[in-house]
Regions:
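Short intrinsically disordered, low-complexity coil segments enriched in acidic
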Residues: 1-3, 31-32
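Bacterial N-terminal signal peptides that target proteins for export
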Residues: 2-14
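C-terminal motif of bacterial Sec signal peptides marking the signal peptidase cleavage site
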Residues: 21-24
């Protein structure tokens, strides 16, 4: 009985070894032994490489607001005078209801309809002039691009033009002004603002200055919408920048 059992054990050993070998070959079919997995007469598998996807251009989104006309008559600056207790001007209340709206924008542009300066006394219709406190209130709301080209640009003649230019030049460096040019030689000096890698050119024109001609001794002048050749040249110049 012992010998028969030994024969059975030996026979099982012979049977198991081929089974293990077959199992090992079978495992190669799953990818571990790919070089020997091609069936006779069949074409070898060809690996097709997929083309690299083209890189997509980065998209920059800027939120822009435009406001006009910021025209300050005597009723408004007298209220501001009263709020300041008779000393100076406080225009804060004028914008407090709309100020939160402008916080949602990256760039805020405004047409400043009246001259802004502390060098000249404030005045109302028909020739406007507004205290400097108004300009500082405009800045505090978030307006940074100031257009000065409109029908009231010449209300105070050459003196008013020079004074309002000095006021805005003294404001923080992030203020951009547009619309007044120091003669024809300055028409190519187009204000450019860069924001998050985007370059923006600002051009501003007016249809009229209420019948007032450009003062002969003015430090700067507007460009009228009728000057189409000049406008076209500025557009082309701005596009190239």
């Amino acid at each position: 009985m012992k010998q028969r059992n030994q024969k059975h054990i030996a026979l099982l050993s012979v049977v198991l070894v081929p089974a293990l070998l077959l199992s090992a070959c079978g495992s190669g079919a799953s990818g571990q032994l790919s070089s020997s997995s091609t069936a006779p007469g069949s074409e070898p598998a060809v690996s097709v490489s997929q083309p690299e996807p083209e890189p997509q251009p980065a998209v920059t989104t800027l939120r822009f607001s435009a406001t006009g006309d910021n025209l300050i008559h005597d009723g408004l600056y007298l209220q501001a005078r009263s709020r300041a207790g008779g000393e100076g001007y406080d225009f804060t209340a004028l914008y407090e209801s709309v100020a939160p709206f402008y916080k949602d924008f990256d760039i805020n542009w405004i047409n400043q309809e009246t001259l802004v300066t502390d060098e000249l006394p404030p005045s109302s219709y028909p020739c406007f002039c507004t205290p400097g406190a108004l300009g500082r209130a405009v800045y505090d709301v978030g307006w940074r691009v100031i257009s000065m080209s409109n029908n009231h640009s010449y209300d105070k003649g050459a003196q008013g033009i020079a004074a309002t230019l000095r006021f805005w030049d003294d404001m923080p460096d992030d203020v951009v002004t547009t619309g007044l040019y120091a003669g024809e030689a300055d028409y190519g000096n187009i204000p450019i603002q860069e924001k998050e890698g985007v370059r923006i050119a600002y051009l501003a024109y007016t249809e009229t200055t209420n019948g007032l001609p450009t003062p002969s001794d003015a430090a700067a002048n507007v460009i009228y919408t009728s000057q189409e050749d000049v406008i076209q040249q500025q557009i082309e110049l701005a596009a190239g920048r």
